[in-house]
C-alpha cells in the first residue's frame, strides 16, 4: 500500500512547478 501511495504522490509531484524544491515536496507529501 505504501508503494502505491508513494507512486501516486510521485505522479502529483510531477505536476508541481519545476521550482518546487525537494524539501517542499517532502513537506507536501512526506
UniProtKB/Swiss-Prot annotation:
<keyword id="KW-0446">Lipid-binding</keyword>
<dbReference type="GO" id="GO:0005737">
    <property type="term" value="C:cytoplasm"/>
</dbReference>
<feature type="compositionally biased region" description="Basic and acidic residues">
    <location>
        <begin position="1"/>
        <end position="15"/>
    </location>
</feature>
<comment type="function">
    <text>Binds medium- and long-chain acyl-CoA esters with very high affinity and may function as an intracellular carrier of acyl-CoA esters.</text>
</comment>
<feature type="region of interest" description="Disordered">
    <location>
        <begin position="1"/>
        <end position="30"/>
    </location>
</feature>
<feature type="domain" description="ACB">
    <location>
        <begin position="2"/>
        <end position="30"/>
    </location>
</feature>
<dbReference type="GO" id="GO:0000062">
    <property type="term" value="F:fatty-acyl-CoA binding"/>
</dbReference>
<keyword id="KW-0813">Transport</keyword>
<comment type="similarity">
    <text>Belongs to the ACBP family.</text>
</comment>
<dbReference type="InterPro" id="IPR000582">
    <property type="entry name" value="Acyl-CoA-binding_protein"/>
</dbReference>
<protein>
    <recommendedName>
        <fullName>Acyl-CoA-binding protein 1</fullName>
    </recommendedName>
</protein>
<keyword id="KW-0963">Cytoplasm</keyword>
